[in-house]
């Protein structure tokens, strides 16, 4: 089957859930037996999100091949279970950089470089390139921002041209917009959506499907009005009500007829979707048998999206154990003393310290790791959380004076965590240890029990590592190195032998978790937290 292209645009306001819609479309098509691939186009001028402030952008989702990408790629992977790559995330900055590099190399033979055709052609080449590289039946592209944004115009023009490149029968435009409900008059207002469609039409794009975000169900008269003013058949006007869980969204869209309409408009067989496992997962989420409290102690907790994949991985593990997860978002800066740690963490059945960069809030994380270690509370450290656990143990158990990380103190007396040799004297952007790396797991360890394997591969995003010069000082202690990278002998996993469940990893297991297939470490962490609550 020749690749078909679906483009998702947004209007009226941002943050309506284009990413979830794109992920849901991918899932509905895959559930019918078609192969899919999702990709995201962001109009910002940063080359990638790698150096962007988490408070502005949320988490950086890392692909298996080391791409630092938009968090929406996490939604795509979790919904479709299709591993994505660097080329599935494109920013305007990446597009312009490629064009300027080509121009400097004489690639345009001295010609004038312009937005049309050069920028639009570069965007089209990336869209079509995804189809060529993956061979997917459907290439689903989300266009960031809202229709009418100045920075998004080259992308809108590029997808307009794509329709004529691949043929109307192989291209579809899905437009997502808000239908506000005014309590005062008890009405859904369609005017903002009408103007959004009108704006899209002014750029030469006629949407094929309208997805309407609303708090209330659409009446027959509302559908008729939208159909009249948008040139879209009523059966292609899909309501998208606010769901209690994001994992209910594809089921709601399927019930609203989206899958059927997609197949009808593409003139392909509307196969029976296989959604039973997903439905069962959602039902389990809504009907837990127990509840536990997990304390997430981090640097960016004011914006939960900064830890989106961690939160979703915890939820998935909770679903596996039929357990509701109550997350305590704790700012590590607020933990300044042992008494603070006890006060903030007293209700936690398990503690997780996720990744981060810089020295802000580090003391609070050290006190958190110490509290978990000394009070036998299940602890899961990720990336920075692993480095914190090693430093805390060196300071308080091994009594290594002034143990620290050279990230926090370049002149640290005892840098238990240090910059990797090949990371010194390099620029910040694009220089981290990124993507999949192998790890050999020690026999009899908690990690081996979780993975049921002696060799794994996990995604990394870091510049600092455990300093192997200090390995001997940890020998014969309670902290063991249960996971090592075989190529460079780097410490990837640490555990405490006498602790019920204390595991910290240098990699990011959250990126590999799926709602109906939780990551083994998250699964066992939640089990340990459940047991901890029972045995208290």
UniProtKB/Swiss-Prot annotation:
Residues given in the record as ATP binding sites: 15-20, 72
Positions of L-glutamine binding: 55, 356, 384-387, 407, 463
EC id: 6.3.4.2
Coiled-coil region: none
Cellular component annotations (GO), alphabetically ordered: cytosol
Residue ranges of the region described as Amidoligase domain: 1-268
Enzyme class: ligase
Regulation: Allosterically activated by GTP, when glutamine is the substrate; GTP has no effect on the reaction when ammonia is the substrate. The allosteric effector GTP functions by stabilizing the protein conformation that binds the tetrahedral intermediate(s) formed during glutamine hydrolysis. Inhibited by the product CTP, via allosteric rather than competitive inhibition.
Binding site for CTP: 14, 149-151, 189-194, 225
Gene3D superfamilies found in the cross-reference section: 3.40.50.880, P-loop containing nucleotide triphosphate hydrolases
Binding residue positions for Mg(2+): 72, 142
Entry similarity comment: Belongs to the CTP synthase family.
Subunit-structure text: Homotetramer.
Protein name: CTP synthase
Biological source species: Treponema denticola (strain ATCC 35405 / DSM 14222 / CIP 103919 / JCM 8153 / KCTC 15104)
């Amino acid at each position: 089957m020749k690749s078909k292209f679906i483009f998702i645009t947004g209007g009226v306001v941002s943050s309506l859930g284009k990413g979830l819609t794109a992920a849901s479309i991918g899932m509905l098509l895959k559930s019918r037996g078609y192969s899919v691939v999702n990709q995201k186009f962001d109009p910002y001028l940063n080359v990638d999100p790698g150096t962007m402030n988490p408070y502005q952008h949320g988490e950086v989702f890392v692909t298996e091949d080391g791409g630092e990408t938009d968090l929406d790629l996490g939604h795509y992977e979790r919904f479709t279970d299709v591993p994505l790559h660097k080329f599935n995330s494109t920013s305007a900055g990446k597009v312009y950089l490629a064009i300027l590099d080509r121009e400097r190399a004489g690639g345009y033979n001295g010609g004038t470089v312009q937005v049309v055709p050069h920028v639009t052609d570069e965007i089209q080449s990336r869209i079509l390139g995804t189809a060529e590289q993956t061979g997917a039946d459907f290439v689903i592209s989300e266009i960031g921002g809202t229709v009418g944004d100045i920075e998004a115009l080259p992308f809108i023009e590029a997808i307009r041209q794509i329709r004529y490149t691949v043929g109307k029968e192989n291209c579809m435009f899905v437009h997502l917009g808000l239908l506000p409900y005014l309590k005062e008059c008890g009405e859904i207002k369609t005017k903002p959506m009408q103007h959004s469609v009108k704006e899209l039409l002014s750029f030469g794009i006629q949407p094929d499907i309208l997805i309407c975000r609303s708090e209330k169900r659409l009446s027959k008269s509302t559908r008729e009005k939208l159909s009249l003013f948008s040139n879209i058949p009523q059966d292609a006007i899909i309501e998208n009500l606010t769901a209690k869980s994001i994992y209910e969204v594809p089921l709601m869209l399927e019930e609203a007829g989206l899958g059927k309409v997609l197949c009808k408009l593409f003139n392909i067989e509307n196969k029976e979707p296989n959604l039973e496992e997903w439905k069962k997962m959602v039902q389990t989420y809504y009907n837990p048998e127990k509840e536990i409290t997990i304390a997430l102690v981090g640097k960016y907790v004011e914006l939960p999206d900064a830890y989106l994949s961690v939160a979703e991985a915890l939820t998935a593990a909770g679903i596996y154990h039929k357990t509701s997860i109550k997350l305590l978002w704790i700012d590590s800066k607020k933990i300044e003393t042992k008494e603070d740690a006890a006060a903030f963490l007293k209700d936690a059945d398990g503690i997780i310290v996720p990744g981060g960069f810089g020295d802000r809030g580090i003391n609070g994380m050290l006190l958190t790791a110490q509290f978990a270690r000394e009070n036998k509370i299940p602890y899961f450290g990720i990336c920075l959380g692993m480095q914190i656990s090693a430093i805390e143990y060196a300071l308080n158990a091994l009594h290594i004076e002034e143990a620290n990380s050279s990230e926090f103190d370049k002149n640290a007396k005892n840098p238990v965590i240090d910059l990797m040799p090949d990371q010194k004297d390099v620029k910040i952007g694009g220089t981290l240890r990124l993507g999949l790396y192998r790890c050999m797991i020690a026999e009899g360890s908690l990690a081996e029990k979780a993975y049921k394997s002696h060799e794994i591969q996990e995604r990394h995003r870091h510049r600092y590592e455990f300093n192997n010069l200090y390995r001997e000082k940890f020998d014969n202690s309670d902290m063991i190195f249960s996971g090592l990278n075989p190529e460079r002998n780097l410490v990837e996993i640490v555990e405490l032998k006498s602790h019920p469940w204390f595991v910290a990893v240098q990699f990011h297991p959250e990126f590999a978790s799926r709602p109906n297939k939780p990551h083994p470490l998250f699964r066992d962490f939640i089990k340990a937290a459940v047991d901890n609550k029972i045995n208290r």
